[in-house]
């Protein structure tokens, strides 16, 4: 079964796990994120801050802060949508509003535009660019950006994403696949 199809049929617990993975990969490697999820999977539904931090120690660069992000986000989502992520994500008519909610909602900790895009793409939604340091460096190297620095505002993220979308059209590569191609060229691997 194709990856996107698996995600479209995943239950809410699996979607929550994927959101946690994206919280873990912010400021860390994809491998660190995967290992961190493995370490806390059994705690995602109800683990305390202390239990999560203990499980992450030696696995993640920021065990205490990431544990706090999980607790705050879980509590917010339990109140907002009873952790029914599929239903909540489907409630948005506009895909940009969906990402804005993840990136800007104060109750969701640890996600900016990059990781919100990462999560949405990983759960099978299309039209979002994952503008990590590898992608930004590639865009800088081919002259599409003046700097490889991450976009610091929503407006800059959207403008950079639009440049990637235009570049995808120019080179005739699917927009939703281009960042993965560029990422794998820089890292030498595809993890998920």
Q: How would you name each of these model-derived features?
A:
Residues 1-7, 67, 82-100, 106-192:
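C-terminal accessory module of base-excision DNA glycosylases/AP lyases that mediates lesion recognition
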Residues 24-32, 44-45, 78, 127, ...:
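Short alpha-helix boundary/capping elements
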Residues 36-39, 76, 119, 171:
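Short alpha-helical scaffold segments that flank and stabilize functional sites
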Residues 18-27, 72-75, 121, 180-187:
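Short, hydrophobic/amphipathic alpha-helical patches that form generic packing surfaces
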Residues 39-109:
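Alpha-helical ds-nucleic-acid-binding substructure associated with the helix-hairpin-helix region
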Residues 1-61, 66-68:
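Structure-specific DNA junction-binding interface
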């Amino acid at each position: 079964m194709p990856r996107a199809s698996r995600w479209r049929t995943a239950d809410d617990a699996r979607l929550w796990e994927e959101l946690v993975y994206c919280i873990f990969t912010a400021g860390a490697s994809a491998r660190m994120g995967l290992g961190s999820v493995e370490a806390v999977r059994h705690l995602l539904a109800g683990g305390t801050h202390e239990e999560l931090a203990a499980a992450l120690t030696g696995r993640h660069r920021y065990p205490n802060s990431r544990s706090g992000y999980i607790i705050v986000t879980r509590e917010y989502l339990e109140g907002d949508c009873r952790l029914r992520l599929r239903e909540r994500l489907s409630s948005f008519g506009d895909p940009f509003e969906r990402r804005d909610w993840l990136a800007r909602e104060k109750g969701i900790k640890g996600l900016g535009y990059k990781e919100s895009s990462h999560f949405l793409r990983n759960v099978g939604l299309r039209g979002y660019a994952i503008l990590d340091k590898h992608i930004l460096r590639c865009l800088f190297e081919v002259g599409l950006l003046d700097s490889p620095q991450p976009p610091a505002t929503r407006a800059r993220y959207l403008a950079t994403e639009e440049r990637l979308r235009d570049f995808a059209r120019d080179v005739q590569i699917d927009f939703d696949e281009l960042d993965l191609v560029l990422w794998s060229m820089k890292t030498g691997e595809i993890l998920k």
